Amino acid sequence: MPDARHANLLEPEALVELFLRHPPQGFAAASEADLPVFGTDFDLLTTLEPAILAKIRRLPLFGLWSRLLRFPARFAGTTATEYAPLPKGLEPGALLDGFRERCAAGQSLLIVKDVPEVSPLLGAGDNEAAMRLARIAPDKGFIVVEGQALAYVPIDFSSTDEYLSRLSKSRRKNLRRKLKSRERLDIEAVPLGDARFGSLDVLEELYGLYLGVYAQSEIHFDLLTRDFCCKAGRSAAWYSVTAMTGNSWATTSALSTAGCSSTSTSGCVTRRHGSSTSIS
């Protein structure tokens, strides 16, 4: 995004602004010197592996003492972007010092969320700045949370057959079976802001599917609001890839950059032939 105000940003700036105007339920969001920040009570068990979390929940009196593991926290970043959008051109040490000065009051934890770790979708400058920030942040009392593993496919092949030829026999067979099922879908790229997203019924259906995905998730951190999802659907600032079969929808936000194809599916849902499936 060459015109972006923020480093590390794969998405349009409009998505950052939308997050600030309509933060997740129970969150408070603001822009501090062009740094998106949000505050919420953070449960230290949130990111534990499910097996470990299950063992902890079986400990005696867990329901009583577990509340002691929740702390007021202020985060630099958003829950709507792949990586933390940081102000361009600001030295990491100065950024962290400013964050502490403006946001530390009343907070038990200061967290920089979704710091990229040598991302193939970012330029060298953004990656180098992120590495410097990750090195110095702990010494300044910050917690650094790396971004989740990014799913992407380098576009270094000329055909589907060439791509499949690189895979194992079982993987090729599985993907060919899935590709055949694609024939039952009518696939169309529908820009957000399209008239179809002006229908409240469509937006309510998609939001209901999102809530179903949220309910099935093992990790509950941010619950996107109806306003956020409706405004996103009616925005023409970025696009979605939407598969439609009859009255069924499958939607994801999508982008491509640096010779790679990446699809962000946070907060998105799929419904195909009457069944609901989560994608994360």
Model regions and ranges:
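N-acyltransferase acceptor-side catalytic subdomain
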Residues: 1-280
